[in-house]
Amino acid sequence: YSPAPMGRKDVLIEGDKVIKIADRIAGDYSELNVKTVEAEGKTLVPGFVDQHVHVIGAGGEAGFATRTPEMQISNIVKHGITTIVALHGTDGTARNIEALYAKTCALEEEGITARMLTGSFEMPSATLTGSVRRDMIFIDKVIGAKTAISDRRSSQPTKAMVEQLAAQAYTGGLAGGKRGYTHIHLGVGARKLSMLKDIIRETEIPP
């Protein structure tokens, strides 16, 4: 699968890169340090992408003892995940944005593709450079922003605040050559998606 079904194939891998995929890869590799894996009956897929990973832990809503621990790379790759987007949970204070950035960099150094979202449940957003737009433009690993609505744990942002956050993520993405999206945690509050529907209807920000 890549991602559509390709049928039965041979795959040649050099180091950490796929060099060739073909019906049959033949050759004399006896003088090389080559390992052959017989994968008959198995399924080969690209590494999975997880767009919502609390790499420095989350929780803490019932006190310090309820905080979840930092994630290790072994817990990520054992499930076939090779690309992650790191983000804050409810707590963006005791777990700061600098720690999130450092962990994102560490995971990439350990061998996976790692990106992150700036901001958290808190508004105004905690950022690395002083603004969401500047994070988007100047911090290579920042690809979007996060906030929360319709949730008792959110900062109860107004529609104008969410509009400004989304606009900064979008325009910063344009300038920085990124998608520039806004990741919004949605709680079980009575307002549900009404704020987002209003923003899509009333502003020029692409949904």
Q: Where would I find each of the regions flagged by the language model?
A:
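Active-site environment of divalent metal-dependent phosphoester hydrolases
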Residues: 56, 90-95, 122-124, 188-194
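Divalent metal-coordination and catalytic microenvironments
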Residues: 11, 16, 41, 52, ...
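Distinct, well-ordered alpha-helical segments
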Residues: 125-133, 159-164, 190-203
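Active-site mouth loops of central-metabolism enzymes
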Residues: 54-67, 118-124, 152-156
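Active-site core of metal-dependent hydrolases
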Residues: 153, 167-207
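Hydrophobic faces of well-ordered beta-strands that scaffold small-molecule active sites
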Residues: 47-51, 84-86, 114-118, 141-149, ...
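Histidine-rich, glycine-flanked metal-binding segment
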Residues: 1-45
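Metal-associated gating/positioning segment near the N- to mid-region
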Residues: 36-102
